[in-house]
Amino acid sequence: MNTNSNTMVMNDANQAQITATFTKKILAHLDDPDSNKLAQFVQLFNPNNCRIIFNATPFAQATVFLQMWQNQVVQTQHALTGVDYHAIPGSGTLICNVNCKVRFDESGRDKMGQDATVPIQPNNTGNRNRPNDMNKPRPLWGPYFGISLQLIIDDRIFRNDFNGVISGFNYNMVYKPEDSLLKI
């Protein structure tokens, strides 16, 4: 029995698991309605050289994209369906092709549970109708959209270093269900 071969297979399986877990972490960040956690997500992106594309629209900086996602996209729920990754030899870089699906809250409310069409008044501190964790309305999930996500990430994720590892992020909706209320 060749122990080198076993180590290689074990290493590949471990890398595949780490890559899938990292991808799930990215999707969980996109689904998180808490805007205070935005800083944790920004740290994953390379601050000097990162390309972000969302449905053929480029973004110059990760913070601009993430603020748009937080403020203009309703609550989401992603489900990972497949991850395929390839290491580029000698570059320390991985190319990940991610297949997933996402559904959107079609209740007409934003991520904070407020009516998406009526802005909240900032001086209503005693408003009892304001949602909190206990009485926040539940999302009304629509049908799933198909998503294709391409990531360019550093292989430092295999050494448990996640700061600035994303240098490419290309998020595309490849399937839109006909019965969705959402217009994209």
Swiss-Prot record:
Residues 111-135 are annotated as: Disordered. Keywords: Nucleus, Phosphoprotein, Transport. GO terms for biological process: mRNA export from nucleus; poly(A)+ mRNA export from nucleus; ribosomal large subunit export from nucleus; ribosomal small subunit export from nucleus; tRNA export from nucleus; tRNA processing. The modification Phosphothreonine is found at residue 125. GO terms for cellular component: nuclear pore central transport channel; nuclear RNA export factor complex; nucleus. Its main location: nucleus. It is found in: Nucleus. Affects mRNA transport from the nucleus to the cytoplasm. Interacts with MEX67. This is mRNA transport regulator MTR2. The lineage of its organism: Eukaryota, Fungi, Dikarya, Ascomycota, Saccharomycotina. The gene is MTR2.
